[in-house]
From Swiss-Prot:
<keyword id="KW-0539">Nucleus</keyword>
<comment type="pathway">
    <text>Protein modification; protein ubiquitination.</text>
</comment>
<feature type="domain" description="F-box">
    <location>
        <begin position="225"/>
        <end position="273"/>
    </location>
</feature>
<comment type="function">
    <text>Substrate-recognition component of the SCF (SKP1-CUL1-F-box protein)-type E3 ubiquitin ligase complex. May play a role in accumulation of expanded polyglutamine (polyQ) protein huntingtin (HTT).</text>
</comment>
<keyword id="KW-0833">Ubl conjugation pathway</keyword>
<dbReference type="GO" id="GO:0019005">
    <property type="term" value="C:SCF ubiquitin ligase complex"/>
</dbReference>
<protein>
    <recommendedName>
        <fullName>F-box only protein 25</fullName>
    </recommendedName>
</protein>
<dbReference type="GO" id="GO:0016567">
    <property type="term" value="P:protein ubiquitination"/>
</dbReference>
<feature type="region of interest" description="Interaction with beta-actin">
    <location>
        <begin position="1"/>
        <end position="83"/>
    </location>
</feature>
<comment type="subunit">
    <text>Part of a SCF (SKP1-cullin-F-box) protein ligase complex consisting of FBXO25, SKP1, CUL1 and RBX1. Interacts directly with SKP1 and CUL1. Interacts (via C-terminus) with beta-actin (via N-terminus).</text>
</comment>
<dbReference type="GO" id="GO:0005634">
    <property type="term" value="C:nucleus"/>
</dbReference>
<dbReference type="InterPro" id="IPR036047">
    <property type="entry name" value="F-box-like_dom_sf"/>
</dbReference>
<dbReference type="GO" id="GO:0005737">
    <property type="term" value="C:cytoplasm"/>
</dbReference>
<dbReference type="InterPro" id="IPR040394">
    <property type="entry name" value="FBX25/32"/>
</dbReference>
<dbReference type="GO" id="GO:0003779">
    <property type="term" value="F:actin binding"/>
</dbReference>
<keyword id="KW-0009">Actin-binding</keyword>
Length: 357
């Protein structure tokens, strides 16, 4: 399928339809196909082993090369996809670039489907999907919405398989189901892409995922070291590594020793100081009967009023020089003299704000 590229002077791209949507074919496969088409123009008949004896050595060699190219093309044509891990964020039309970049286009181009397999990017993608579910779901195109739910399906199946991060996905599905209920009940008040029955099916799918996660049973490891075998100081060190209070509470329910360590006032004080400032402490100060600060209660009280710091292993970055959004590990073709000075980390909320016009 021919498609006009980003530059109006380009010859255009070749695309192929797959399960994840339309994917652009690699440039070298197009050149190979072009060579084969040129060969077809000069020879309109099919050569077989019996006919080759009639032709000269030059024609025999040409026919042999042609068959090898045809065989190579058939073996590799389904694998020669090209996907850039960056996208140019333009907000206005120019002679070279028509239109502007949308949230849905960026969502499709940045390959979030592969990012969820990277443990460093998993939490980042989940948080982004959650923010989209809360406020930006209807702004996505039909293809982007389909891609959104395909990625979500892969995330749910991954969690059901490896039993990691179920709480994050439960929170995401809860927000998504609430949004879908509001959209379905208020049909006609907002513009929905697709038939209303599609949205009802999506809600039913989300409810089914929630039920599957609710029935998820953690398998106990029979062999090897467990948390109970570790010394107390190491268990305390593990708790101090957490940046989420709910993770500390959940881990404290495993053993009596961890329960005692999870109530450490110094632990919750460090957590409050990491996420919040002194002015916020003064506004929501909670004291015990003895006059001590209840840091654990303060953390959950402050969490209701202020956003906590977000921490991710790998995030998207924005290049101010090139106006390109990209994964830090993947990089992009930057033309700046000092590229590192032009890079800015992009939080999930900042990612969405980039496409608000």
């Amino acid at each position: 399928m021919p498609f006009l590229g980003q530059d109006w002077r380009s010859p255009g791209w070749s695309w192929m339809k797959t399960e994840d949507g339309w994917k652009r074919c690699d440039a070298w496969s197009q050149e190979l196909e072009g060579e084969n088409s040129q060969c077809d123009i000069g020879h309109g008949i099919i050569l077989n082993s019996e006919d080759e004896e009639i032709f000269s050595n030059e024609e025999h060699e040409f026919a042999s090369k042609k068959r090898k190219k045809d065989h190579f093309r058939n073996d590799t044509n389904t694998q020669c996809f090209y996907r850039e891990n960056w996208i140019y964020v333009h907000k206005e039309s120019t002679r070279e670039r028509h239109g502007y970049c949308t949230l849905g286009e960026a969502f499709n181009r940045l390959d979030f489907s592969s990012a969820i397999q990277d443990i460093r990017r998993f939490n980042y993608v989940v948080r982004l999907l959650q923010l989209i579910a809360k406020s930006q779901l209807t702004s996505l195109s039909g293809v982007a919405q389909k891609n959104y739910f395909n990625i979500l399906d892969k995330i749910v199946q991954k969690v059901l398989g490896d039993h990691q991060n179920p709480r994050l996905i439960k929170d995401l599905l809860q927000d998504l189901s609430s949004t879908l209920c509001i959209l379905i009940r208020g049909v006609g008040k907002s513009v929905l892409v697709g038939n209303i029955n599609i949205w009802i099916c999506r809600l039913e799918t989300v409810l089914r995922w929630q039920q599957q996660l609710q029935n998820l049973q953690m398998t106990e490891v029979d062999s090897g070291l467990t948390l109970s075998d570790l010394p107390v100081h190491m268990l305390s060190n593990i708790l101090y590594r957490f940046s989420d209070g709910w993770d500390i509470v959940t881990l404290g329910q495993v053993t009596p020793t961890l329960s005692a360590l999870s109530e450490d006032r110094q632990l919750w004080k460090k957590l409050c100081q990491y996420h919040f400032g002194e002015k916020q402490f003064c506004r929501h100060l909670i004291l015990s009967e003895k006059g001590h600060v209840e840091w654990k209660l303060m953390y959950f009280a402050l969490q209701k009023h202020y956003p906590t710091k977000e921490q991710y292993g790998d995030t998207l970055h924005f290049c101010r020089h090139c106006s390109i959004l990209f994964w830090k590990d993947s990089g992009h073709p930057c033309t700046a003299a000092d590229p590192d000075s032009c890079f800015t980390p992009v939080s999930p909320q900042h990612f969405i704000d980039l496409f608000k016009y």
